[in-house]
Amino acid sequence: MNRYRYESIFFRYISSTRMILIICLLLGTGDMSAMGLKKDNSPIIPTLHPKGNENLRATLNEYKIPSPLFDTLDNSYETKHVIYTDNCSFAVLNPFGDPKYTLLSLLLMGRRKYDALVAWFVLGRACGRPIYLREYANCSTNEPFGTCKLKSLGWWDRRYAMTSYIDRDELKLIIAAPSRELSGLYTRLIIINGEPISSDILLTVKGTCSFSRRGIKDNKLCKPFSFFVNGTTRLLDMVRTGTPRAHEENVKQWLERNGGKHLPIVVETSMQQVSNLPRSFRDSYLKSPDDDKYNDVKMTSATTNNITTSVDGYTGLTNRPEDFEKAPYITKRPIISVEEASSQSPKISTEKKSRTQIIISLVVLCVMFCFIVIGSGIWI
């Protein structure tokens, strides 16, 4: 009789231990990935195969940011003006200035390789807000722009990253269901072997959507141009959003889940283009006292007499391969995922999450040890 009682206790003990082990595995992951779900019950977006990430680095230039006025106060090209009226789809920002002509020039000079940088900014009253930054090294002039052996991850403004991504040509900025507050003057800066290609596009948002994300505009994030002499992505709290295509899929799924128009191919023809603006439009825009624009809170006036370019202040990309060997390799999964929930605190870092996982695992192990001791005592 005692034998059957002990066997029953033993099997109950084994079942309890197995359940604790399963709980430990789920908690140890720090998310719901063990069950194939995110915390919001949406499917996990797969990242690229590790082989597709072997040429990605966190940064190639020690986190430095060029100035949106890297070229001149005046634009290199006419300013394109587009109007977004398609309420729940994508706004496509594609200013003038194609890098293929620069690559062709390099090819004719016998240069087979180049380094490059692509950055997006939104301009305000005597200030600029970095939106996106990505660097390229050891690229081929015989291939389309961005065909490189080494790339950095895309560094993003945290708020723009939730609903924006860069198109597969590495150049166009795509914004999903933009709200009216995102109207403004956007600047794209391309630097190829130190030569800048600067181009602007004025976005006017007339149609908006019920789920368009608000609260993206923040005057405190629009920095005076003097900031960019020594500015870095760290000083701006910019984030790495993982592999570009996984980031793109995040944004598209967010739009689709909210009932937006998810077209198979995002094209620029969805935008209404009006007459182009002159090259000097940027200068007049920066000086305009329009209160609807970004306004650097530290500036007491709208004058731009003291605005100068910062070509000498940017010492980022070089042509020396040894400079890129110093940059640390990244992990294969996104460093900071793009979460759709607006309640998520931007202060939570992956390091804090790792410490929490360790503490939870230790607590579970202690409970398991107690069960083993108690079970051994009962069996004896």
Swiss-Prot record:
Transmembrane segments: none annotated. Pfam families: Herpes_glycop_D. GO terms for cellular component: membrane. Coiled coil: none annotated. This is Uncharacterized protein US1141. It comes from Gallid herpesvirus 2 (strain GA) (GaHV-2).
